[in-house]
Amino acid sequence: MTGFSIDFVSPARFNSLAAEISFESQILCRIDKEREDGVFEIEFFHEARLLGAEVKMKFSVQDLLKVVDQACADLRDIPA
């Protein structure tokens, strides 16, 4: 999962922690479980923080799925 990072955040309007996934310091998305039924949702931030042209936003699908799975597993492990 080279280039990816997971940061846990606590937006003021959220009841629980969320996980932000970045690639080469460019934020990609945030995963949260704010729904009443506890289902994870993903919100993409395609223009939240634009870096220079040296950051190529292209990576393997398998690596992205691994980091999304890891973020969801980490969020499940956090006590409510």
Task: Please state what every model-predicted region is.
Residues 1-80:
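Terminal leader/tail segments of proteins
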